[in-house]
UniProtKB/Swiss-Prot annotation:
Cofactor requirements of the protein: heme
Stored CDD domains: CYP51-like (cd11042)
Family the UniProt entry places it in: Belongs to the cytochrome P450 family.
Enzyme class of the recorded protein, top EC level: oxidoreductase
Highest taxon in the source lineage: Eukaryota
SUPFAM superfamilies xref list: Cytochrome P450
Molecular function in Gene Ontology: heme binding; iron ion binding; sterol 14-demethylase activity
Function: Sterol 14alpha-demethylase that plays a critical role in the third module of ergosterol biosynthesis pathway, being ergosterol the major sterol component in fungal membranes that participates in a variety of functions. The third module or late pathway involves the ergosterol synthesis itself through consecutive reactions that mainly occur in the endoplasmic reticulum (ER) membrane. In filamentous fungi, during the initial step of this module, lanosterol (lanosta-8,24-dien-3beta-ol) can be metabolized to eburicol.
Protein name in the entry: Eburicol 14-alpha-demethylase
Any Pfam family hit: p450
Length: 515
């Protein structure tokens, strides 16, 4: 008996049946959207394929997707992200609604916890009660004191200069450099040297900086929905996680060394590095921070801030290479305001370099590294001024980068123009403050410019981030001129494959040593 026709017929039958089910699901999905939709919920972005929904359009270019959807549905709408209903609320009102949502109504831990805990460690950030996280943020915030920031400037400059002298990327009088790799190394070395201390910095190698690329890919939108998916980039992220855990083992020895030094000194002197600060902190119930939690907080501090600093510094140099005259203005600003001999940078010098600050602000406006902020809805949330109620089955999505690119707030918004900040001042309303447990802060959501977020999860390292970027860029501009590669205009496109946006690779520029 010939089984081939029988098997072939069975395969064709299964194929026809599967295709039929697929087509029926599409038809039912379309009918549901057009006829049986819930008028009390935000409109759903039209899509043909169930489960997939608008995942592809969102993943390829979130901002293009947001602006196109807003043109059709308004500031508030829902789209399907890998089977999950994700409600977007754009504009300053949306930022207020989501980022300043009440703790009983919105939850960040359920969105980010599964991804961050294996990397950052247990009992910190999204692996602990929110009240404990707020205390941890307070410890970190007060570790970034004025005294500490002042002491960081020469350290950042030294690390940057050391990289220039030792890296093969800067050998000779001119050449090309892959900024993504170079800035990843520089920013992780400066962050480690300042925030973590010399002992921890000495244990970091360029390999650790390289692995941040793999970790970035682990923070992709699909992983927030399907963290268990056996995707290629997850294997690399696991490798990075293992390395990070090995590094965290160094922190207990560092804290032990600190304790021994303090006992030998028999005095009350204070170190300015973050480990020294955390060693002195206690929780509200009187419990000192365990060494394990200090280790995990230090890993978090190193990783969380490095993503943004690396990407933004890369974008800054790409912009300067595309407009070399702006880099020359930055160099001239230093000569004019600091002296022709360009003395070593000090903290007080930063206020004398307003154009440098504006270059950083403008780059943050257009190239914010995080395009999406998510919260899980815990209770039905009525949307003020509308008839909509967002149910607990939804995830909320805020995108402060949309307001930063909105022509209603910024003239010619897609043009990179640092000079726009000379006549524009972003002032936070001091009367609109709240204390989430780590000190009074401005809610901040009424501003269209929120590069560091807002609400209880607002980044507390804003001052350090600005300082780190200012010193790194000022140091590089002293030494080099930057240009685009031959035949290239503008800057590379943005890679949105991770939730941490960055330039499409390779991000290459030409450099020349200043004579």
């Amino acid at each position: 008996m010939d089984l081939v026709p029988l098997v072939t017929g069975q395969i064709l039958g299964i194929a026809y049946y599967t295709t039929g089910l697929f087509l029926v699901s599409i038809v039912l999905n379309v009918i549901k959207q057009l006829i049986f939709y819930n008028r009390k919920e935000p409109p759903v972005v039209f899509h043909w394929i169930p489960f997939i929904g608008s995942t592809i359009a969102y993943g390829m270019d979130p901002y293009q997707f947001f602006f196109a959807s807003r043109a059709k549905y308004g500031d508030i709408f829902t789209f399907i992200l890998l089977g999950k209903k994700t409600t977007v609320y754009l504009g300053v009102e949306g930022n207020e609604f989501i980022l300043n949502g009440k703790l009983k109504d919105v939850n960040a831990e359920e969105v980010y916890g599964k991804l961050t805990t294996p990397v950052f460690g247990s009992d910190v950030v999204y692996d602990c009660p929110n009240s404990k996280l707020m205390e941890q943020k307070k410890f970190i915030k007060y570790g970034l004191s004025q005294e500490a920031l002042e002491s960081y400037v020469p350290l950042i400059a030294d690390e940057t200069n050391a990289y220039i002298k030792s890296s093969p990327n800067f050998k000779g009088q001119s050449g090309t450099i892959d900024l993504a790799a170079a800035m990843a190394e520089i920013t992780i070395f400066t962050a480690a040297r300042t925030l973590q201390g010399e002992e921890v910095r000495s244990k970091l190698t360029s390999e650790f900086a390289d692995l941040f690329h793999d970790l970035d890919l682990g923070f992709s939108p699909i992983n927030f929905m399907l963290p268990w998916a056996p995707l290629p980039h997850n294997a690399s992220a696991i490798k990075h996680t293992t390395y990070a855990r090995d590094l965290s083992g160094n922190y207990p020895s560092a804290t032990g060394s600190w304790r021994r030094r303090q006992r030998r000194r028999q005095d009350k002197s204070k170190g300015t590095d973050m480990i020294s600060n955390l060693m002195r902190c206690v929780y509200r119930d009187g419990t000192p921070i365990p060494d394990k939690e200090i280790a995990h907080m230090m890993i978090t501090l190193l990783m969380a801030g490095q993503h943004s600093s690396s990407a933004i510094s890369c974008w800054i140099l790409l912009r300067l290479a595309s407009q070399p005259e702006m880099a020359e203005k930055l160099h001239a600003e230093q000569i004019k305001n600091l002296g022709a001999d360009l003395p070593p940078l000090q903290y007080k010098d930063m206020d004398k370099l307003p154009l440098l600050r504006n270059v950083i602000k403008e780059t943050l406006r257009l190239h914010s590294s995080i395009h999406t902020l998510m919260r899980k809805v815990k209770n039905p949330m009525p949307v003020p001024g509308t008839d909509f109620v967002v149910p607990p089955s939804h995830t909320l999505l805020s995108s402060p980068g949309v307001t930063a690119r909105d022509e209603r707030h910024f003239r010619d918004p897609l043009r990179w123009d640092p000079h726009r900040w000379e006549s524009r001042v972003e002032v936070e309303d001091s009367s609109d403050t709240v204390d989430y447990g780590y000190g009074a802060v401005s809610k901040g959501t009424r501003s269209p410019y929120l590069p560091f977020g807002a609400g209880r999860h607002r980044c507390i390292g804003e001052k350090f981030a600005y300082l780190n970027l200012e010193v790194i860029v000022a140091t590089l501009v002293r030494e080099f001129r930057f240009f685009n590669p031959e035949g290239m205009e503008g800057v590379p496109d943005t890679d949105y494959s991770s939730l941490f946006s960055r330039p499409v690779q390779p991000a290459t520029v030409r450099w020349e040593v200043r004579s």
